[in-house]
């Protein structure tokens, strides 16, 4: 949903939904209301001293990440932040969520904005089904039944004629999907799904501090619990990502970039699509501890799209909170990288140059205290979106079927490392929408049924959903677009590189290859792609409502590295030959 990097990064909110920055943190938790924070310890601090400081400030630790020194704390003390921040062992703190609010029918302003912009990912959805949405029968030798619909795999030569001939991946290579979960029972994921190592680091959040529904009532869950199993995806995003990386060659549906590697679900995203700090860093440090080789991160950490340490638009409290997000996330990235994890992240879908000043009106997008709403901020280039702009992260932009940078993809010379196909439904000769110019990957059947996208006989009734059957086994797939779809294709190539060149991992089994080597090969084997000529590229889109949208993005840099494509478009075949 909207919290992913598949949505527009910079939303324009209605004026009534905005509050000036001075108001944003004037709203405080009512006395006695239990609130949750994340507290970051000073590097090298004695954990016992930090724990004592939290207790002295009126907090109770409910979870602790000892790898980087981050604790989740509950408290009823409205002065907790000020009290704990004065301790020598504490680096900073940030709101996590309020607990125990009463559900109402209200919707948060940021959620309303999200509903307007999430069409970036699902543009074209809702059209009637085409006649050929169900496939069966025998494909060409070694090709999957839906291979002809995978223009994205052809673009990076992850095909039967390309990389599959030389390297399909090694079962011992582990790719962590830090996302909303993975449907481990999907027929085109299950053969490569590692349930033993998969974890869910989240707890469902029924409502925010304003009473707006977030994940919904826990009693409405299939298991009537706020703790989902580690093999489900009640959103659809994580399943699409996992399938793009490693759907097997099994005579059903599609194949991923690395069809023989193992997928590990490292769930850090809520059902609603929010990604909070503690689950995100827990997923990263766990990845390092258990021997994950590559992780894909197609999201940003809420509630701030951009984190600034000294933005005059923000209150001192907001600046301190954003500094905590930056420091804690970077510690987790450093930890995972040092443990041998290659970090791949989506560049974002705001259609913005991240090396230039922009305006963000979407943050804070989650109400941690009653009355909190997003407000407009001018964002200098020094502010960062985490984890995509973190050190050690390979930032991936998105291309369409023609190899142009997708209209929604963020860009910036020095920000983008590489490019990969993520789809562009307006990359058509007439600049009109074609859902098949998105990317096709696995879709949980339960969600397709819940959303009314299947007929009584199981056939899809919408154009963006495709069914593939092998005997009595049927699986579903959907078209999506976004840098969230580009990033896993790059992560899949990274997994192939580890499979091809990795050495035995004596600690965890399987293979291991230093991230710096993986990144070097990934960039060196990418197809160099120059800026368009002229570099100011105009995107024209004829929208379904009859209106026309025209935007211009300026590409800076050389063919060797530029703001649209970085070092080039990933090439699976060149990476493994």
Predicted regions and their residues:
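Secretory targeting and sorting signals
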Residues: 1-24
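Autoinhibitory propeptides
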Residues: 27, 51-149, 404
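C-terminal subdomain of the subtilisin-like protease fold in secreted/lumenal serine endopeptidases
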Residues: 29, 62-63, 291-299, 476-477, ...
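Short, surface-exposed ligand-recognition loops at beta-strand->loop->(often short) alpha-helix junctions
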Residues: 36-46
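Structural recognition of the beta-strand scaffold that forms the well-ordered cores
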Residues: 38-39, 63, 72, 92, ...
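Active-site core segment of subtilase-fold serine proteases
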Residues: 135, 140-260, 282-324, 349-367, ...
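Mature extracellular/periplasmic domains of secretome proteins
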Residues: 163-170, 255-258, 274-297, 307-312, ...
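Extracellular S/T/G-rich loop segment that most often corresponds to the catalytic His/Ser-adjacent loop
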Residues: 204, 369-495, 573-574
């Amino acid at each position: 949903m909207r919290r992913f990097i598949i949505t527009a990064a910079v939303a324009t909110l209605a004026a009534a939904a905005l509050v000036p920055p001075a108001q944003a943190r004037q709203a405080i938790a009512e006395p006695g209301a239990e609130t949750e924070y994340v507290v970051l310890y000073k590097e090298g601090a004695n954990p016992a001293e930090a724990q004592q400081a939290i207790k002295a400030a009126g907090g109770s630790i409910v979870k602790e990440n000892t790898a980087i020194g981050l604790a989740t704390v509950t408290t009823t003390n409205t002065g907790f932040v000020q009290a704990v921040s004065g301790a020598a062992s504490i680096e900073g703190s940030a709101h996590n969520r309020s607990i125990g609010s009463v559900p109402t029918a209200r919707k948060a302003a940021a959620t309303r904005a999200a509903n307007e912009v999430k069409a970036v990912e699902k543009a074209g959805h809702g059209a009637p089904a085409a006649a050929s949405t169900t496939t069966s029968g025998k494909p060409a030798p070694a090709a999957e039944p839906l291979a002809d619909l995978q223009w994205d795999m052809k673009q990076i030569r992850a095909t039967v004629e390309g990389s599959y001939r030389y390297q399909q991946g090694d079962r011992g290579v582990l790719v962590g999907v830090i996302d909303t979960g993975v449907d481990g029972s999907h027929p085109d994921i299950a053969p490569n799904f590692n349930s033993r190592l998969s974890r869910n680091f989240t707890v469902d959040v029924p409502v925010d501090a304003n009473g707006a529904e977030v994940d919904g009532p826990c009693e409405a869950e299939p298991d009537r619990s706020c703790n989902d199993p580690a093999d489900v995806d009640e959103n659809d995003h994580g399943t699409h990502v996992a399938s793009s990386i490693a759907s097997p060659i099994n005579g059903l549906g599609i194949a991923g970039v690395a069809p023989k590697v193992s997928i590990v679900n490292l769930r850090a995203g809520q059902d609603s699509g929010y990604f909070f700090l503690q689950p995100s860093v827990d997923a990263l440090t766990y990845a390092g501890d258990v021997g994950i080789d590559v992780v894909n991160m197609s999201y940003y950490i809420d509630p701030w799209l951009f984190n600034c340490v000294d933005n005059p638009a923000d209150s001192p409290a907001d600046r301190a909170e954003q500094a905590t997000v930056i420091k804690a996330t970077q510690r987790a990235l450093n930890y995972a990288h040092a443990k041998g994890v290659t970090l791949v992240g989506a560049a974002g879908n705001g259609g913005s140059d991240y090396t230039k000043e922009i305006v963000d009106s979407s943050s804070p997008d989650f109400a941690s205290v009653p009355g909190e709403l997003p407000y407009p901020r001018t964002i200098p280039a020094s502010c960062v979106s985490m984890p995509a702009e973190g050190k050690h992260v390979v930032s991936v932009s998105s291309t369409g079927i023609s190899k142009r940078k997708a209209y929604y993809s963020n860009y910036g010379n020095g920000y983008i490392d590489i490019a990969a196909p993520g789809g562009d439904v307006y990359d058509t000769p007439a600049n009109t929408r074609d859902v098949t110019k998105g990317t096709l990957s696995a879709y949980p059947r339960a969600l397709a049924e819940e959303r009314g996208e299947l007929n009584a006989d199981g056939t899809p009734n919408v154009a963006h959903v495709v069914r593939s059957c092998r005997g009595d086994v049927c699986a579903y797939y959907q078209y999506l677009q976004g840098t969230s779809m580009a990033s896993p294709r790059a992560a899949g190539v990274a997994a192939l590189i580890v499979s091809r060149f990795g050495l035995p991992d004596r600690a965890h089994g399987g293979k291991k290859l230093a991230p710096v080597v993986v990144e070097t090969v990934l960039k060196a084997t990418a197809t160099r792609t120059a800026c368009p000529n002229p570099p100011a590229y105009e995107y024209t889109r004829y929208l379904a409502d009859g209106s026309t949208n025209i935007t211009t993005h300026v590409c800076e840099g050389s063919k060797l590295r530029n703001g649209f494509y970085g070092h080039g478009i990933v090439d699976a075949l060149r990476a493994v030959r």
